[in-house]
Amino acid sequence: MTPVTPAAFEKRDNVVIFDTTMRDGEQSPGASMSHDEKLELAKILEEMGVDVIEAGFPIASNGDFEAVREIAKIVKNSTIAGLCRAHQVDIDRCAEALKGTQRGRIHVVIATSDLHMKHKLQMEPDAVIDVIARSVTHARNLRDDVEWSAEDATRSDRQFLRRAIETAIKAGATTINLPDTVGYTYPSEYADLFSWMTQNVEGADKVIFSTHCHNDLGLAVANSLAGVQGGARQIECAINGLGERAGNAALEEVVMALKVRGDKLPYETKIDTTHITRASRYVSAITGFPVQYNKAIVGKNAFAHESGIHQDGMLKNRETYEIMTPESVGQAPSSLVMGKHSGSHAFRAKLKDLGYELGQNALKEAFGRFKDLADRKKHVYDDDIIALVDDALARGSERIRVQRLRVVAGTDGQSAELTLEVDGEVKTSEASGDGPVDAVFNAIQQIVPHDAALRLFQVHAVTEGTDAQAQVSVRLEEDGRIATGQAADTDTLTASAKAYVNALNNLMARKEKSRPEAAIASGF
C-alpha cells in the first residue's frame, strides 16, 4: 500500500477523520463494548465515511486482538489502525491482528515530555530517540502505513520534540500525531505548535500531521480545529466525545464545525453527516453513557426552541436560529405519533427516519416490543421508539436475563420477588429493602452474589405523561472496574432491574479482559 501524501490531501482540501471510539473511547471508565458491538460500530463508522478506525490495542487483551482482527476483515473502505507501544512484541502483535486487510495502520506511541520520560518511562532523552528509531523502522518493515504519536506532545520541549519527529519520519512514519494528552494546551498554542513543526521539521512535507485532543479544560474541539489551522490534516476524535477522564474531541462537533464554517476552515471531510445521530445513539446505547440534553449536534435539545421569539423566527425562516438542519445530521424531521394500529411497514419507515437500519430478525423483535409498548401507552413518540431500540442494543451479551418481577410496596415495608435466568438456569429470590428499588437490587444480589458497589442510579422520563417510559442508568464498580447499564420500560422498577442486570453483564465482560503490565492508561 502506498501511503497518501499530505500534498494529495491538500489538493482535495481534505481533513482525515480518525475515529478512536473503540480504543481511547473505551478507556472511559464503564464504557466497555462487547466484540459484536464493536463489529457493528465499525460498520456504522465505515458507512459514515470515517477514514481511519482505531479498533483497539491488540496486545492489551485477546478481546482487543480479536476485535481488531475481525474488523480488519469486514471493513473494506476505511483504514483499520491498531495501537501499540514502542516495543517489538507490541508491534508484532498489532501487525498480526491487521493481516486480514490491505488498509491497515500500525500506530506506535511513546512519551516525549520531560515529565513522562523521567517518571513513567524512566529513560534518558537519547534512549527515547533510539527507541523511536528502532520501533518505527520495525513497524514500517511490516506495514507501509505507520503512525507515530508523541504522548504528552504539548508539554514536551519543542526542540526535543522536533528531534523526535524527525527521527520518526526518517524511520518511515507516514503520519505524525501530536497529542494534547492531558487537555492542557490552548488553541493559539496548539495552532502555533503545528505551524512551527510543519515549517521547521525536516521531512514535514512527506507526512500528515495529526491532532489528538483531550477535553480536560473543555477545549478539545477548539484545539483540534486550531491544529488544522496550524497545518494538521488529520483529527483524532470519538463519537460523543467519549474518552479518558473528560473525554476526547467529539467527532460530530469537529465534522460539523468544518462543514458549517468552511468560510474559515476551507477543508472537507468524507463524512456523510446524515449518519451522525445514528452513530451517537448507538454508542450511547452500548456504553450506557447518556448524551446530555444540551450536547452540541446530537443532544435532545440541540434543535429545540422554546422561547416565543425564537419560535416565531423559526416559523418564518429556520435559518434565523439554526445554523444547520436536524436532517443534515440524521435527525428525523418530525415527531410523528404512532400507536397500536401502526403496521410493520410504518414502523420500519419510522426507524429509518430515526437513523436505524435493523436486520429482519432484529426488526421483527423490535416491532413485537413496539406493539407491546403501544398496548400500554396511548401514544408512542419518536423518543419512545429510540429508547425501545436502544434498550435492545444495550443488552449486549446476556448471561443474566430478567424473566419476572413482582414488587409489593406500602407503608409497612417493601419487598420484591424476582426471577432471573443465569447462564440458562432459572433462579428465583425474594428480598426486602429500604424502598422498592433497594428491594429489587437486593433480590438480584441474592441470586448473583457480587461485591460491586452502586455508583450511579439515574432515572428520567423518556416522554411526558404518567404512562411515559422510564429510562434508567446504573453504574457499578468492583475492584477498580466500572460498568454501566441502561434500560427503559413503562414500569420504573422493571427498568431498574433490567438496567442493574445489564450493568452486571457488562461488568462480567470487563472481568474477562486483562491489560498488559505497562498498558497505556492515559489514552495519550
UniProtKB/Swiss-Prot annotation:
Family annotation (InterPro entries): 2-IPM_HCS-like, 2-isopropylmalate_synth_dimer, AIPM/Hcit_synth_CS, Aldolase_TIM, LeuA/HCS_post-cat, LeuA_allosteric_dom_sf, LeuA_bact_synth, PYR_CT
Protein name per Swiss-Prot or TrEMBL: 2-isopropylmalate synthase
Pathway: Amino-acid biosynthesis; L-leucine biosynthesis; L-leucine from 3-methyl-2-oxobutanoate: step 1/4
EC number(s) from the headed UniProt entry: 2.3.3.13
Top EC class for this record: transferase
Residue ranges of domain Pyruvate carboxyltransferase in the record: 15-277
Domain of life, source organism: Bacteria
GO cellular-component term (any): cytosol
Cofactor names: Mn(2+)
Record-linked HAMAP family: LeuA_type1
Keywords: Amino-acid biosynthesis, Branched-chain amino acid biosynthesis, Cytoplasm, Leucine biosynthesis, Manganese, Metal-binding, Transferase
Sites where the protein binds Mn(2+): 24, 212, 214, 248
Regulatory domain: annotated span: 401-524
Upper lineage: Bacteria, Pseudomonadati, Pseudomonadota, Alphaproteobacteria, Caulobacterales
Similarity remark: Belongs to the alpha-IPM synthase/homocitrate synthase family. LeuA type 1 subfamily.
Gene Ontology molecular function: any one: acetyl-CoA C-acetyltransferase activity
